[in-house]
């Protein structure tokens, strides 16, 4: 009897130790889990939520997260120059992670800028902010903003981070407008006519994004300023561009809605600017104002000497007077027939890539496509600078289906096969490398300094990026399902013709007025003005030898896919 009792007692003692260890293990596991959860909560609170980023919950799921790669191996082409360095996963949201450092930095910059700029007033009752005293211009009042019948429509631009009253006034005055209007805290509208309907002052209650305490309109409301003093001083620096000599249409008075006799070129340009027309047409001493049309499209300029008589007042001009020649000038007025854009009304199930190597003109082509189609373009990345300048599709997830096409610099089989069709934009690698290095050092509109060009950074940049230019094109030629190849240089030479090809590829109906408007405003707001100050030749002979080898290989690959080869200017001399 005693033996079974001691056996039971021994078992219970062992069971106690066993339960004790189980309890300790359970508590330790629970503590670790609690600490991990607390860490994630703190991490999310510091970075913002998916909702703050404008992404759906699905957009951060496995089905949308792909590990990005620098272009894969470039066979037989200086493999040692390829970007094959692996980057470890750092502590940040998954959608920020990419193996290409440039793209990762781009996403990280957008992420931090966007989180920083979240409006703390969202969800709180609106309050009236007092108008600050403004030295430039005179505040007129709060007016109703009707998007369909907008009065201040001559020039429209956005700045969702840094819009101020002075910024809008200066921009409108520079273009010689009389009135500047601000809405939604970030939108600026210019024009020469005051809106018709006034609104209550308290309805203009949106604080300017870049200036605390000042008012920049409201929802469908404009804070309007008169720029009379600035307008007078701006006339001295009026930005009028000579477009060329053209043959005037036969029914000139019917095509151009406004005309005035006996005006000089300067007077005609000022007259048409005041009437808010983008073109001033001078035929002898007659002045006409209007837009490019199908009958007068500015596609075929004539020899300058044919219009010289008008300007010089020579005897020859008497003979020319009987001919239908005219001189055309671009006024500061923006052609607004193609500035309205929107998201696709029905989500598309077809994903079309607008693919290019960085520096190949992707942003410029997006500007052309958006204004020609009227629909926003999307992006595989999130560039806050572009979003703040009006590329509203930049914020949408690339698979939202609401944009006409999606910008990408990615390559590799997996990344390319995610798209149903693609527009491959190719630019001369010498020009593309310089453009991307300028963007990297000076931003979208700036230039690298001479110090940058002579530093070690430039050779390292060429060593890495030159091979990427080649492998990017080769990968898309190999894995792209349905491909349209567009050369940047061809687009510059034949803008309308190449735009028609792209619109047909995108299956978008062609609107002739929008195309004429695009041609009239083809540069947009992302063209680098002037030229780089550096006169140095940035490419060494060794660099040229490597790049020329890449050019020959891409040219051969294009012809193998039955595309025309690279333009002659690419080819090594």
Curated annotation (Swiss-Prot):
Residues bearing glycans: 239, 251, 262, 312, 315, 562
Protein known as: Sialate:O-sulfotransferase 1
Major subcellular location class: Golgi
Xref: PANTHER family: SIALATE:O-SULFOTRANSFERASE 1 (PTHR45964:SF8), WSCD FAMILY MEMBER CG9164 (PTHR45964)
Single Gene Ontology MF annotation: sulfotransferase activity
Subcellular localization, as worded in the UniProt entry: Golgi apparatus membrane
Extracellular domain ranges by topology: 36-573
Residues in compartment: Cytoplasmic: 1-14
Protein encoded by which gene: wscd1
Keywords on record: Glycoprotein, Golgi apparatus, Membrane, Repeat, Signal-anchor, Transmembrane, Transmembrane helix
SMART domains: WSC
Highest taxon of the lineage: Eukaryota
Transmembrane segments: 15-35
Topology relative to the membrane: Single-pass type II membrane protein
Function of the protein: Sialate:O-sulfotransferase which catalyzes 8-O-sulfation at the Sia-glycan level using 3'-phosphoadenosine 5'-phosphosulfate (PAPS) as a donor, forming 8-O-sulfated Sia (Sia8S)-glycans.
